[in-house]
Amino acid sequence: MSETDAGAPGAPEAAEGQAPGIRILAQFIRDLSFENPRAPDALRAAQTQPQIDLGVEMNARGREDGLFEVDLKLSARATRDDGALFVVELLYGGVFQIAGVPAEDLEPVLLIECPRYLFPFARRIIADVTAEGGFPPFMLDPIDFAGVYAARKAQEQEQVGHA
């Protein structure tokens, strides 16, 4: 699910008077996969809209240089009654420098705000690759990363309660 290392060497400490800040130092595709198992038959117009299952995961980890790597994993599977139309998976990453954020607030910044910065770029990649696969561009709706984070934390708490 999510992994953070708030105690990484060089992790930012909230200095008095220092304004919180997030700098994106790099963005990159870590992994990209597109499957079009029924091409070209699946490309014909159909009477029914496909069912699309969407998956979202966010992960973060501290690096030794005091920076943080954040990964946003998006997966989408489009199906109709007669089977899969396409499957796309993207693992999009970024390297962030975080300043002026107290340690107790670092995890939400890494798993909510940083993915929020990465999302428009990842969304565009998925739209482009589905269009290149012969389908209309798949434009992801905006994602409520705070809601996803809260749901994951609740699930983690539930698992701890059952352990």
UniProtKB/Swiss-Prot annotation:
One of its GO terms (biological process) is protein tetramerization. InterPro entries: SecB, SecB-like_sf. The keyword Cytoplasm applies. It is found in: Cytoplasm. Gene3D superfamilies: SecB-like (3.10.420.10). GO terms for cellular component: cytoplasm. GO terms for molecular function: unfolded protein binding. Its main location: cytoplasm. It comes from the Bacteria. The keyword Transit peptide does not apply. Keywords: Chaperone, Cytoplasm, Protein transport, Translocation, Transport. Homotetramer, a dimer of dimers. One homotetramer interacts with 1 SecA dimer. Belongs to the SecB family. One of the proteins required for the normal export of preproteins out of the cell cytoplasm. It is a molecular chaperone that binds to a subset of precursor proteins, maintaining them in a translocation-competent state. It also specifically binds to its receptor SecA. This is Protein-export protein SecB.
